[in-house]
Regions:
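A basic/glycine-biased coupling hinge at the interface between accessory DNA-binding modules
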Residues: 1, 19-22, 41-195
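Active-site alpha-helix of zinc metalloproteases
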Residues: 5, 34, 57
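Pre-Walker A adenine-sensing motif
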Residues: 5-16
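Glycine-rich phosphate-binding loop at the start of an alpha helix
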Residues: 8, 37, 189
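Walker A/P-loop
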Residues: 19-38
């Protein structure tokens, strides 16, 4: 199969590009996914790259499924070992193989927003904090921000020791993390952070 058929000059150039990083800037509907899928097929068929050495990450499940389908149309059954998915699904795949190194088992549970709110509600009750002052949504937003900036509960508590409210938020964060760990659970931020 000719993996360059139907591509314009710039697309062909991207598909056959040598080694190293390549940044493609193009607007919606310009053929970026087409270039990526043809590049994957080209690397496997023409350059001998093993499928499990290719990682293609998208933002949405829809885009990931579309990419898998397109690569499948080009390569047939050679896509089983390809890593095509969203950031989170790729992280789950990596963690299922390696999370034991972090003290979790591979059958960890992923907490959705409802589960997270339930855990925070338990934490607020356990720490005897006022549920009107410490709202689940606000606490979860803070925990998410802290995780995304790689601030641990202890660091946050130490940084905010003189601030009663923030110190309590830090205590909530610490208890939240403990409860997730005790239940072999991860939230969506953990999927990225722990990978």
């Amino acid at each position: 199969m000719d993996y360059l058929e139907g591509l314009n000059d710039k697309q062909r150039e991207a598909v056959t590009y040598g080694e190293g990083p390549l940044l493609i800037l193009a607007g919606a509907g310009s053929g970026k996914t087409r270039v990526l899928t043809h590049r994957i097929a080209y690397l496997i068929e023409e350059r001998g790259v093993l499928p499990y050495n290719i990682l293609a990450i998208t933002f949405t499940n829809k885009a990931a499924n579309e990419m898998k389908e397109r690569v499948g149309n080009l390569l047939g059954n050679k896509i089983d070992d390809l890593w095509i998915g969203t950031f989170h699904s790729t992280c789950v795949r990596i963690l299922r193989r390696n999370i034991d190194k972090l003290g979790y088992s591979s059958n960890f549970v992923i907490y959705d927003s409802y589960d997270q709110k339930s855990v925070v509600k338990e934490c607020i009750k356990e720490l005897n904090l006022d549920k009107e002052t410490y709202k689940e949504r606000s606490i979860l937003s803070t925990i998410s921000s802290l995780k995304n900036t790689m601030v641990t509960p202890d660091e946050y508590i130490n940084e905010n020791y003189g601030n009663f409210y923030n110190r309590n938020v830090g205590e909530l964060y610490a208890l939240y993390e403990k409860k997730l760990k005790n239940n072999n659970g991860l939230d969506f931020d953990d999927l990225l952070l722990k990978t």
